[in-house]
Each structure stands twice: as C-alpha cells, then as structure tokens.
Amino acid sequence: MGRGWGFLFGLLGAVWLLSSGHGEEQPPETAAQRCFCQVSGYLDDCTCDVETIDRFNNYRLFPRLQKLLESDYFRYYKVNLKRPCPFWNDISQCGRRDCAVKPCQSDEVPDGIKSASYKYSEEANNLIEECEQAERLGAVDESLSEETQKAVLQWTKHDDSSDNFCEADDIQSPEAEYVDLLLNPERYTGYKGPDAWKIWNVIYEENCFKPQTIKRPLNPLASGQGTSEENTFYSWLEGLCVEKRAFYRLISGLHASINVHLSARYLLQETWLEKKWGHNITEFQQRFDGILTEGEGPRRLKNLYFLYLIELRALSKVLPFFERPDFQLFTGNKIQDEENKMLLLEILHEIKSFPLHFDENSFFAGDKKEAHKLKEDFRLHFRNISRIMDCVGCFKCRLWGKLQTQGLGTALKILFSEKLIANMPESGPSYEFHLTRQEIVSLFNAFGRISTSVKELENFRNLLQNIH
C-alpha cells in the first residue's frame, strides 16, 4: 500500500512540475541574445563597460554631434579618389551606381573653406596673407618678416612630420575634389566578394603584427579553419603586448563599425521613382550573430566599443587646441562659424566629463628605446593601412575608408602628443602641434561614424528582440 501511494504522489508531482512550467526546456535564444549576449559588461584592457558607453553616446552625445556634422565646415571634405593603388595593379572597379561619388561643383563649397588659409588660426592667417601679398607684388623673400618666414617653415616642417599616422592626400593636386559627405553617405553599395575581401585580408594579414603561421578566424580567403585555429589565434592575441593587441582591436572595431553602417543603410527596395534604404536584419545577423559567425560577431562588436573609447579619449585630450581664442571653424559665415565653435566646445566639454575614459598611459611605457621603436612600428603599420585605401575598387567605400582611417590616425596623433598639446601657447601660431582642416573634419566625422554605429546597435537590438 505504501509503495502504491508513493508511486501516485510521485506521478502527481511530475504532472504538477510539467503543468507549472518546472522542468520545461528553456525557450530558444532570441536573435538579439545571439548577437548581443556577450556584448555587455567591462571591455578588455579597459575600466569601462558597454552599458555606460551606450547611455553616454545615445542620450548625451549623439544628437549634438550629428547637428555639428551637418554644418558646412564638417560636411565638405577634400579628397583625391584617383590616386593609384601603390601595392597591386589589378584593381577591379565597381560599376554600380551606388559605388559612385558625386563631387561638388566649385560654387557649392563656401569660399572660406576653399581659401588656402583655412588650416590656421586668425593670427596665423594674417601671417600667411602677408606672405601671399608679397608674392603677388613680386617681392623677394627678404621682404617677408622674420616671423612669417619662421611660421611658414614650421608649418611645412609639421606637415611633413613623422608624427602623422596617415599618408594624407595632396589636397593641392588638381585631382583632389571637394565632396559633400551628406550627399554621399556611407551605406551598402553592393561592393563585396573577393575584391573586397582582398583589401581586408591585406590589412589583417600584413599590417596587424600577425605571423603567417597564425590563422585568423573566419577568413573568407582561407579554407579548412576550425576551432583549434580560432583558439590558437586568440591565445596568440592575448600573448601580445598591450599596444599590438590594441592595434588589432582598433582595426577590427573599424571593420565592425563599417559593417554596422552597411547593415543599417541597406538598399531594401528600388523602383523607377525611388530607392528605399533601411535596416537589413538578415545582413546584420550574418555579420554579428554569435552562432552564424562561430562566436566572432560579438567579439567584433566589443572591439567597436574599444575603438569608440580610443577616439573619445583623443577628443577629450585635444580640447585645449580648440579652446584657444583665435581658433575658428572658418567658412566665411561669421555668425554660423561662432555658433558652430560654441557647439563644438560644448560637445568636447561633454566628452571631457565622461567618467570612464581609456587610460593610454599604459601604451609605450617601460624601456624608452623599445617603446620608441614600438611606437614607430605602430605608426608605420597604420600609415600603410591608410595607403591601402587607395586600392579599394568602390569609390564610395574608398571615400569613407580614407576619411575614417585619417580620422583614426588623427586620434592616435593626438593621444601621443600630450606634452605638445600641454605646451601650446594660449594664442598665436602653435608650431609644435596643430591640426589641419582635413584632420579636423576627418577626426569628427570618423567619430561620428562610430557614434552612429553604437546608436544603431540599440536599434538592431530592439528589432531583433522578438526574432528567434
């Protein structure tokens, strides 16, 4: 009798467990969980967490930054898209309409931007005007003031400086043209396949301090890779010094950011009358879903946040350069220029207040000789990547690739110029540290792209929430 009652109670208990939900299988992960479950908490080599960045960027910074980037000073970027590829000759040009770039007509660009003196402060501009006037009057060099000669020499020296992390375009070249970035937005162009893979393969395989024996996960140009190769790669990566590991993560973060943009501004529908652009959830999942990418997607997104922190830190450190009274965002429209400078300083002070900035003091520490060599290797590798952008077969992709690598290169230049920035005079020309207009425009637009990516991650997270 006791056994019978025991069996009955056990059976009733099992029925109760099933009916109450206990013992049920867990519901399958949502698509949002597969893409974002690992994209949370603290970032490697940092004291900052993803959630703090999301709140700061999406609600305090993003709206004001977008307003600034829509202004004339930041929307016009001069670029040479016709420079030949320095590494190989067989470039396959993308023939799709969406790959094309529409340059500005001469009368579309404000005169203040086109003038040769836009790079410098008001006092420096006056010195250049003196130089230009002397040249127009046919005066000999001796007629220039000693101060002017010194300024011109210093600027020339700086523009050829070994502190630059990018090989910048010669904007005086007849092939360099102004492009309206708002009319040529970064979005999906259809440029993909072996030609696009080749660009990224050269960047990762030859410029990220990686030996050939170490295989990169999910390399589309390699075959037969598995879990062992992935484990070997990350064991190698973790064994690198912090500088080389950071270099790889910056490039991976930039790659991830670009892929977010392409997924967020995808050509969804095309008719004779219009094109419809929007979020392509499938495209995003193929690039970042933890299962579809064998765990790589979430890692790439965390590297995007790392890139965000690096550029955010650079902007916080360069504030004194823009605070100088004679610095202008000069376009020729005095009222607009003053308003834009106020907005710029407001944004930079907001960035300065960010509580968990990346600490770059761990970079290039230790033995001075070794640190100097490592910094030079770091600079040359990144400079080489900026040259690879001239090999991109899609002109729209080339435009944004050149701008974003120059922007990141400018951020690195700022991070490693702390003493020069601290020693700048409060007014007058800054001989030791200055930024050209090209560097300023690329710096803020590049950060604007990363800021947009972080904002778009919130949009994709919401879109994927109910998809399994």
UniProtKB/Swiss-Prot annotation:
GO terms for cellular component: dendrite; endoplasmic reticulum; endoplasmic reticulum lumen; endoplasmic reticulum membrane; extracellular space; Golgi lumen; intracellular membrane-bounded organelle; membrane. Disulfide bonds join 35-48, 37-46, 85-391, 94-99, 94-131, 99-104, 208-241, 394-397. Its EC number is 1.8.4.-. Its cofactor is FAD. FAD binds at residues 187, 189, 200, 252, 255, 287, 300. Pfam families: ERO1 (PF04137). Induction: Stimulated by hypoxia; suggesting that it is regulated via the HIF-pathway. Changing residue 131 to A: Loss of regulatory disulfide bond formation and increased activity towards P4HB. Loss of regulatory disulfide bond formation and strongly increased activity towards P4HB. Enzyme activity is tightly regulated to prevent the accumulation of reactive oxygen species in the endoplasmic reticulum. Reversibly down-regulated by the formation of disulfide bonds between the active site Cys-94 and Cys-131, and between Cys-99 and Cys-104. Glutathione may be required to regulate its activity in the endoplasmic reticulum. It is an enzyme of class 1 (oxidoreductase). The keyword Cell membrane does not apply. It is found in: Endoplasmic reticulum membrane; Golgi apparatus lumen; Secreted; Cell projection, Dendrite. Changing residue 145 to A: Abolishes phosphorylation. Does not affect interaction with ERP44. Belongs to the EROs family. This is ERO1-like protein alpha. The gene is ERO1A.
